[in-house]
């Protein structure tokens, strides 16, 4: 009886593989698109039973070729909020997901998929309800529209369907994402390359480096996925963040102080980091002004009601662990 993970060579998918392996699960079918061959690195240390291209997988899954499937973790998508090709985005994120949902419901396979906090757009209420959902870009819209499809399917569903709205996830195995990698990743790379970190300046009433996001460690994201895997009677759409909004300044400072701690140097305050030149700012890009989420913070009420009780890592401990991983991987 297999477990299937789409997007298995991606950031969250590959971390989910690692979490499953730690449980002793190895009968796993990994599904992805390895056109970017370098992403094989995220699979190389995972124990899996098979690999399939995402296009070959779709038809075979619909036919029931894989026998009894314990769960399908659908993590595959185009995750670029800067992608402007709406036709590509809707086919890759929306239509593909719809086909997997339909097949999963017909086969009775638990279906756990990645949604996104991008569905909330520029709003200040991050609750899983239609009135708060106003995406700012076609990526957010593709996730939003599929969530609506799921909401219509849930009342008649005879097997588990779970959507997890990921907030700002950071952690190991994201380097292939380039510009879409986390703030923590880019801060670390800037610091190692240039000896300083540079953040966006003032925008939308927020001071330099003061934009607020809900940053959540990828290890916590994997744990929440496995919580629902362990409780197949629970369905719905749930926020997945830390439940706390932190500034980009705090992320940058956590990275700076983590690197300093690894070099046996004392921590700095934000003011000290700025005055020493380790942290600076640049003008906010004009191209992002109309489609930028300046503030996010997950409302975790529904997730807690669904039985998830574990604490989330603090930003400081999560970033410290991530910086150690990056240093080992250099």
UniProtKB/Swiss-Prot annotation:
InterPro entries xrefs: Epimerase_deHydtase (IPR001509), Heptose_epim (IPR011912), NAD(P)-bd_dom_sf (IPR036291)
Chain sites annotated for binding substrate: 168, 179, 186, 200-203, 213, 292
EC number: 5.1.3.20
Active site positions, chain numbering: 139 (proton acceptor), 177 (proton acceptor)
Keyword Isomerase: yes
Assembly behavior: Homopentamer.
Summary of the function given for this chain in its UniProt record: Catalyzes the interconversion between ADP-D-glycero-beta-D-manno-heptose and ADP-L-glycero-beta-D-manno-heptose via an epimerization at carbon 6 of the heptose.
Entry protein name: ADP-L-glycero-D-manno-heptose-6-epimerase
Organism: Pseudomonas aeruginosa (strain UCBPP-PA14)
Gene: hldD
